[in-house]
Amino acid sequence: MALACCLLAVIARPASAASVQLRETGSTLLLPLFNLWIPDYLASNPNVTITTAATGSGAGIEAAISGTAQIGASDAYMSDEQAEQNTQIVNIPLAIAAQTVNYNLPRNGGTPLKLDGPAIAGIYSGKIREWDAEPIKALNPGVTLPHHEIILIRRADASGDTFVFTQFLDFSTPSWDDKIGYGTSVAWPSVPGEKTAVGNAGMLKAVAETPYSIGYIGISFADEAAKAHLGTAMIKNQSGRFLLPTPETMSAAASELDSRTPPDERLSLAFAPGDNSYPLINYEYAVVSTRQPDPAVAKALRDFLLWANSPLGGNTPKYLNAVHFVPLPDFIRASSEQQIQKIE
């Protein structure tokens, strides 16, 4: 009788929910935010496992398309060609980020250099070779600049940071638009002495270890850039003002363009108009397939993204301030929620 009772107790005990695994891969700029989100989310959702990988935005988009990851994290939205060929894939903004232009100038002092699109394009096309070249001097009157070769550093991987950086150059500099354009990968001009790096961590390391270098780095690495004593350039916007990325200048830039966001949410925020608009900002995307092969995976993916998008969940200052992102406007968050609900 006792044995029968024991067996009955075992049979009557409710089974624990099956574990569901989600895989995130892609943007190195967005990765620090996922690394803040995931432990807190999993603490309340122990039956879900989420893995992350820093592979670059281009790889993240491809992983979402191929189905090798449920979340392709990206600073770039899909191209028109990708969107036309993969109608099951949606681009879901999660936050607003920025890119910084950082440099390693020994004995430069604490005053940020001022740069504009044509000067940066000149550096990355090889037309401006020294730090004291006239186009840079003209933007920085009274600043002593070294007569030393500029060592430019760019991304080697398919990068959302490259996408936003080259969009800014494309929109602000006609000669760049005519010859190079923008994308997660572009046909970079060959410049003597140039270096390449993989990921934002790689860019930060390369600029920090290379005196007289310049590079572009995602703002989620701003604290590390400051610890490495890198300078951050003030960038000239459409109104002719030189600005650093702050919550105010990033939000101002987003407010100039976010009303143009289409239903599929693919929109560039680079080089926005407005006196107080920092010109190198972007939506941070989760690129996701709406057609998941397993209903349990689809539900876990929906639930996580709804939490990440919520002002009561992941879209709060606790998380966003730590990586120097700004939250989505309410109407963009509502549009993102509509896209998330399509996942099945």
PLM features: residue spans?
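Bacterial N-terminal signal peptides
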Residues: 1-10
